[in-house]
């Protein structure tokens, strides 16, 4: 009785008419006999019941024992998932445990008039038949072990044909884990109460949250299982649910090797009468062999239900949720053999391990005695090794040969061709499969000469090789070539492969560029070369092949290296790509100037040979050089992806002064160039709303009317500088860009420079009171001023934008530039056209007004909108002269000391006499449009008021609005 272990058990009397004989009960455990009683009690009353035992507890054997106790005249339909493996399992157990006649429904012409007792049918076959009214069954059972009820087509077909007529549902998954599944099951068994006929009412009563929410711990597990308990209580009278850990002493019921061996024996004995073809038998056994955890079930071929048995030995209360999440039934079985990247090589390596000689003699010996068809096949094969190929067609034999030959040369092929095969498409993989199979009949190499004799010779050699039923690759091969299985086995495709072989043999040394014949032909050569060593008996016929192969294999290896070095994207070319990591120095600003890297210029290959000049990189904080010299592995870029296109687009927009509004924050050293490029894409619209945002290192969103950064550059021909007003401490100066090189200044270092200044100001109570009294009101006025009419600051922004566009062209023409107001380099620094930066000693005359007027410059800058552009020296002199001639200045002889400027600002804020230039008064400006010349004059007036390069002078107030 195959793998079933006999125990001295008495027969099981279910009723006066039903008896499970001791011939059956001796192979069942006590808990399986309990399940037989449970199901029969409901079945005798024509009631619906659910056999919901966990996977591995022998549900199919239980049902088979139950069916053996029923009268043979009763006809039972078992609806299965669309899986040959499940179908074979049912046939195996019914044939082994019972004497019932089993019929498989396959088409429209099948009827129930035949003298069979059990009818097995896949739900897809029943759905294709359509009208099932002519099929009369006494009992209907649904096997949900393949999650068939999760398929809406299967559920709709069952509800349409068998609603209220199903007697037994077999399921390994806890059906209380899904409310919709339970609702459909109760509809099939006619167990729904009247108030729950509609699913909305049923769901309102027994609603369960989504399992995803449970897994993410957004829902209390105690409440979840409390609700699951309500469902279990609702169906407890007609459901049987038990777990594996309750019967640990008796599990596993069968060893996986023993089960596989006996299933092979049964398949071999039934092969001549089986409705399964040879390839389907092989695929069934191969799928069983590929999943060894699934064979722990004894009398039950629930291979698909057994994947999750390692996770179900936990607590009883937790097991239903775990089953639903981790229990995969039949679908993943077809996925597992093809899970690899390289299916051709995996197939051959699996054949190496699994097709072993010890398995073949027990499979062959009963075959010689039992099957006369196999004996006749053996006579024609000219080799004394019989095999179970009784029903194989020619195409199936060719399919066998595709995976069997590479057994002996798998390792050599794997070493040389794994990167190549990865690059081939499916069609090339199929061509290499045919090439793999061509040299294997080394005993009949003459057949390769003519294409006509090749398929017949191959068919002769197919029968010579012992076919093991436990080969795991057939399902994977069907998965690989599902759309063109017939093309692989057709002789026409083989003809083309042979023609290519004839054509490319002399051409291999000349044309080394084509890769398609190279890959397939090299596999052919290594196949035959490796075959020539173990097969010494047939060495006479194949002795001329290695002489041709040796010169042809040698140029193949360096050519493979050449093609690999041409494509730098592969992972095995890392030694060649090591010179490339310095390329971030070109793309990130301050390493090289624009002389080495223009916009959209190709990156030079010898970047390491280019030595950067001495003063190319200024004295900067430590984090910036670390960022520039990061290896390319820290960037999220491959070696072939060094050039970041968005960065080049950003450089094209600002040729001279690179836009740094998106780099105002301190650089994170782990930030990649791709991230920076993406950031530049996100924020290019910010300079539209601001004035002169391109050349400053301040974030545009934080600027207000009282929080403006000074201009960094002066484009005047004269190199003398105007001392600038200090920015607010809330907006630190964080960097500037010249010629594409950037100098970063971080928050900590700027805080050391600028934080003591607010403390000095806060010590004076007068300034503190002034800021608290007037600054909120002034900020409101500056914010609401654009709503009334375009005022001076807005016009000034337009002018600043135009001057910025002009500045791009003129900046490259000058030789020397001086940059002021930088805490790291002193107040002035000089930059020549080659990019060298040098500090400049300042004369005392220009330092003194800056030192004396720091506080007043801050106050003036906070009240009046700070200027963005500095006027030239000639314009400044004319403005000062016009100020002196103005008759309306209230104070003629006042020095621009600290007290004078403070009192002047105080008087202008309080609106005494001459307050028209304040930003408060600008709200009530006349409604006539102001021309740009007036705004330029106002800008220059405020620029001169903040202190000139010639020191403090006497000024008169200029009235703009009379």
Curated annotation (Swiss-Prot):
Residues 372-382, 553-562, 673-683, 885-894, 953-962 have a biased composition (Basic residues). Its main location: nucleus. One of its GO terms (cellular component) is intercalary heterochromatin. Keywords: Chromatin regulator, Chromosome, Developmental protein, Nucleus. GO terms for biological process: chromosome organization; DNA endoreduplication; double-strand break repair via homologous recombination; heterochromatin formation; maintenance of protein location; negative regulation of DNA-templated DNA replication; positive regulation of DNA endoreduplication; protein localization to chromosome. SUPFAM superfamilies: P-loop containing nucleoside triphosphate hydrolases. It is found in: Nucleus; Chromosome. GO terms for molecular function: ATP binding; chromatin binding; DNA translocase activity. InterPro entries: P-loop_NTPase, SNF2-like_sf, SNF2_N, SNF2_RAD54_helicase_repair. Residues 386-395, 524-552 have a biased composition (Basic and acidic residues). It comes from the Eukaryota. Residues 438-448, 480-489, 564-576, 703-712, 866-880, 916-944 have a biased composition (Polar residues). Residues 353-413, 438-590, 658-712, 866-900, 916-962 are annotated as: Disordered. Required for underreplication of DNA, which is found in many late replicating euchromatic regions of salivary gland polytene chromosomes. Controls chromatin organization in polytene chromosomes. This is Protein suppressor of underreplication. The lineage of its organism: Eukaryota, Metazoa, Ecdysozoa, Arthropoda, Hexapoda. The gene is SuUR.
């Amino acid at each position: 009785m195959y793998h079933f272990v006999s125990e001295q058990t008495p027969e099981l009397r279910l009723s006066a008419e039903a008896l499970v004989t001791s011939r059956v009960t001796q192979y069942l455990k006590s808990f399986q006999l309990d399940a037989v009683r449970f199901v029969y009690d409901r079945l005798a009353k024509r009631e619906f019941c659910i056999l919901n035992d966990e996977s591995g507890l022998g549900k199919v054997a239980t049902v088979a024992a139950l069916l053996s106790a029923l009268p043979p005249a009763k006809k039972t339909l078992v609806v299965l998932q669309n899986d040959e493996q499940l179908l074979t399992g049912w046939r195996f157990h019914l044939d082994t445990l019972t004497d019932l006649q089993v019929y498989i429904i396959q088409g429209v012409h099948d009827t129930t008039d035949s003298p069979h007792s059990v009818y097995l049918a896949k739900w897809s076959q029943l759905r294709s038949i359509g009208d099932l009214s002519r099929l009369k069954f006494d009992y209907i059972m649904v096997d949900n072990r393949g999650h068939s009820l999760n398929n809406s087509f299967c559920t709709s077909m069952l509800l349409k044909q068998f609603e209220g007529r199903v007697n037994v549902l077999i399921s390994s998954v806890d059906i209380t884990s899904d409310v919709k599944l339970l609702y459909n099951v109760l509809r099939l068994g006619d167990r729904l109460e009247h108030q729950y006929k509609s699913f909305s009412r049923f769901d309102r009563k027994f609603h369960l949250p989504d399992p995803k929410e449970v897994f993410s711990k957004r829902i209390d597990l105690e409440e979840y299982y409390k609700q699951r308990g309500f469902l279990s209580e609702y169906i407890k009278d007609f459901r049987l649910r038990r777990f594996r850990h309750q019967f640990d002493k008796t599990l596993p019921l069968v060893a996986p090797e023993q089960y596989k061996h006996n299933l092979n024996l049964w398949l071999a004995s039934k092969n001549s009468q089986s409705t399964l073809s040879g390839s389907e038998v092989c695929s069934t056994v191969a799928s069983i062999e590929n999943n060894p955890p699934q064979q722990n079930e004894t009398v039950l071929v629930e291979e698909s239900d057994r994947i999750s048995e390692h996770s179900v030995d936990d607590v009883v209360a937790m097991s239903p949720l775990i089953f639903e999440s981790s229990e995969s039934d039949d679908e993943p079985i077809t996925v597992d053999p093809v899970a690899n990247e390289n299916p051709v090589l995996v197939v051959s390596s699996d054949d190496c391990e699994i097709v072993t000689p010890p398995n073949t003699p027990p499979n062959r010996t009963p075959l010689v005695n039992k099957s006369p068809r196999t004996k006749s096949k053996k006579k024609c094969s000219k080799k004394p090794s019989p095999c179970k190929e009784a029903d194989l067609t020619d195409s199936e034999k060719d399919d066998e040969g595709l995976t069997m030959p590479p057994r002996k040369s798998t390792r050599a092929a794997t070493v040389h061709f794994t990167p190549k095969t990865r690059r081939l498409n499916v069609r090339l993989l199929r061509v290499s499969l045919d090439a793999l199979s061509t040299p294997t009949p080394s005993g009949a190499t003459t057949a390769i000469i003519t294409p006509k004799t090749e398929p017949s010779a191959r068919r002769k050699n197919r029968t010579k090789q012992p076919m093991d039923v436990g080969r795991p690759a057939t399902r994977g091969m069907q998965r690989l070539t599902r759309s063109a299985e017939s093309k692989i086995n057709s002789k026409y495709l083989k003809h083309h492969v042979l023609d290519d072989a004839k054509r490319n043999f002399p051409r291999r040394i000349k044309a080394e560029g084509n890769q398609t014949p190279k890959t397939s032909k090299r596999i052919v050569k290594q196949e035959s070369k490796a075959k020539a060593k173990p097969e010494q008996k047939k060495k006479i016929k194949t002795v001329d092949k290695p002489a041709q192969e040796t010169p042809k294999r040698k140029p193949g290896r360096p050519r493979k290296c050449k093609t690999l070095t041409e494509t730098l994207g592969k992972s095995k070319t890392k030694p060649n790509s090591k010179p490339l990591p310095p390329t971030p120095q070109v793309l990130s600003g301050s390493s090289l100037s624009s002389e080495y890297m223009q916009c959209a210029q190709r990156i030079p290959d010898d970047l390491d040979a280019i030595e950067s000049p001495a003063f190319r990189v200024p004295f900067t904080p430590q984090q910036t050089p670390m960022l520039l010299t990061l290896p390319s592995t820290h960037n999220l870029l491959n070696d072939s992806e060094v050039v970041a296109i968005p960065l080049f687009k950003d450089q094209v927009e600002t040729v001279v002064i690179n836009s740094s509004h998106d780099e105002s924050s301190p650089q994170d050293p782990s930030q990649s160039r791709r991230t920076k490029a993406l950031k530049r894409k996100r924020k290019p619209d910010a300079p539209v709303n601001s004035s002169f945002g391109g050349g400053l290192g301040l974030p545009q969103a934080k600027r207000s009317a009282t929080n403006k950064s000074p201009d960094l550059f002066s484009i005047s021909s004269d190199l003398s500088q105007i001392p600038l007003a200090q920015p607010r401490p809330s907006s630190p100066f964080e960097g500037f860009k010249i010629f594409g090189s950037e100098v970063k200044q971080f928050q900590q270092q700027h805080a050391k420079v600028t934080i003591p200044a607010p403390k000095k100001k806060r010590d004076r109570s007068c300034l503190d009171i002034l800021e608290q009294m007037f600054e909120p009101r002034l900020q409101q006025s500056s914010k609401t001023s654009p709503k009334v009419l375009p005022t001076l600051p807005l016009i000034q922004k337009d002018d600043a934008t135009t001057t910025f566009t002009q500045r791009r062209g003129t900046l490259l023409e000058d030789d020397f530039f001086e940059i002021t107001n930088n805490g790291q380099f002193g107040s002035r620094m000089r930059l020549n056209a080659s990019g060298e930066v040098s500090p400049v000693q300042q004369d005392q005359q220009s330092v003194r007004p800056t030192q004396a007027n720091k506080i007043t410059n801050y106050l003036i800058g906070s009240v009046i909108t700070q200027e963005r552009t500095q006027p030239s020296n000639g314009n400044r002199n004319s403005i000062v002269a016009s100020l002196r001639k103005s008759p309306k200045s209230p104070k003629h002889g006042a020095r621009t000391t600290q007290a004078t400027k403070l009192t002047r600002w105080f008087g202008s804020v309080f609106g005494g006499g001459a307050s028209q230039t304040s930003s408060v008064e600008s709200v009530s400006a006349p409604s006539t449009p102001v021309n740009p010349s007036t705004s330029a004059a106002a800008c220059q007036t405020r620029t001169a008021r903040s202190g000139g390069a010639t020191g403090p002078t006497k000024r008169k107030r200029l009235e703009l609005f009379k």
